[in-house]
């Protein structure tokens, strides 16, 4: 079986990008080790401060962010990083080739109950002869050269695309390497599973409420078939399920908090997941445009997200 370095070396992936991916995934292995320690290492619970999103940080949010930041800014191929947990971008090496944006610990509210979490990352090639600025980082998702996530579940898995399909790697703790276990993953175009936080239904648009009501009505409704609902409360877990067995994930626009009409971050969550889904034959949209076509206006910009099985995304958009 091939491990991650072998797969990248046998592809058209540039050596400098291989280096960035190696640093990223090696750090995720260290994060996985830290997660396994849990209460034994005193790393659960709140850190006692908020991030730029106005969210209370968990101790492991801060720990995982610092681990990735320190490792990546030391990588000669990295020009700058942006993190969900950092107020501003962090310039690294002026002669580096790549920007990397990441959510160091997606689903961190799950940490204290020992449920699924993950690290999401997005990589762009962007060279220059001056220190990087936030304006340099505002690149549409269609320009990503790689995207992926590491899922910390019963096994630790890496899901990765470099623009030539989606591969899944399982971490082998005896060898401390990611080994290729699922190649060229494809998402079925039709589905009978959906993932959405139903507690927010009253805040959605009328069109979205109508769509979800039709799913819930099942065979007795206009869809003529039953649907199951799933919700992990971590985007990384819900998207992983869709890549493994199909479905649609929706975090729609809502009016619960007008300052955060979209919940998920474009740069750290929506763009990398959209690239993965499209590479696997799915679709990713906001309800007004393709996610990968969005011109970012700020590194912490939020958007609505509808992604998954191509035909079901189209059906949702038709409402």
Swiss-Prot record:
Any one GO molecular-function label of the UniProt entry: magnesium ion binding
Any Gene Ontology biological process: gluconeogenesis
Binding site for Mg(2+) 2: 103, 106, 269
InterPro entries: FBPase_C_dom, FBPase_class-1, FBPase_N, FBPtase
Cofactor: Mg(2+)
Cofactor binding remark: Binds 2 magnesium ions per subunit.
Entry keyword annotation includes DNA damage: no
Primary residence: cytoplasm
Protein residues bound to substrate: 106-109, 197, 263
CDD domains the record matches: FBPase
Subcellular location(s) per record: Cytoplasm
Family stated for the protein in its record: Belongs to the FBPase class 1 family.
Name this protein carries in UniProt: Fructose-1,6-bisphosphatase class 1
């Amino acid at each position: 079986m091939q491990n991650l370095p072998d797969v990248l070396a046998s592809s058209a992936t540039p050596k400098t990008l291989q280096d960035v991916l190696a640093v990223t995934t090696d750090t995720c292995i260290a994060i996985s080790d830290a997660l396994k320690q849990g209460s034994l290492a005193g790393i659960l619970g709140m850190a006692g401060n908020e991030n730029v999103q106005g969210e209370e940080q968990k101790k492991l949010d801060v720990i995982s962010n610092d681990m990735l930041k320190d490792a990546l800014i030391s990588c000669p191929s990295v020009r700058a990083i942006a993190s969900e947990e950092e107020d501003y971008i962090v310039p690294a090496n002026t002669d580096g080739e790549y920007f990397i944006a990441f959510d160091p610990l997606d689903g961190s509210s799950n940490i204290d109950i020992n449920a699924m979490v993950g690290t999401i990352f997005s990589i762009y090639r962007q060279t220059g002869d001056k220190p990087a600025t936030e304006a340099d980082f505002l690149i549409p998702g269609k320009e990503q050269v790689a995207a992926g996530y590491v899922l910390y579940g019963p096994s630790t898995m890496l899901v990765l695309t470099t623009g030539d399909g989606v591969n899944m790697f399982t971490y082998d703790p005896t060898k401390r390497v990611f080994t290729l276990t699922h190649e060229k993953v494809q998402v079925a175009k039709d589905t009978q599973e959906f993932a959405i936080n139903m507690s927010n239904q009253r805040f959605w648009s009328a069109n979205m409420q109508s769509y979800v009501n039709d799913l819930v009505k099942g065979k007795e409704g206009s869809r003529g078939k039953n649907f199951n609902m799933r919700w992990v409360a971590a985007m990384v877990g819900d998207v992983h399920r869709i890549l493994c067995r199909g479905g649609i994930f929706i975090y729609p626009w809502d009016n619960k908090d007008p300052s955060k009409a979209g919940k998920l971050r474009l740069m750290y969550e929506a763009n990398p997941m959209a690239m993965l889904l499209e590479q696997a034959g799915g679709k990713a949209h906001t309800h007004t445009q393709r996610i990968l076509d969005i011109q970012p206006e700020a590194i912490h910009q939020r958007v609505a997200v509808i992604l998954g099985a191509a035909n079901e995304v189209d059906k949702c958009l038709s409402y």
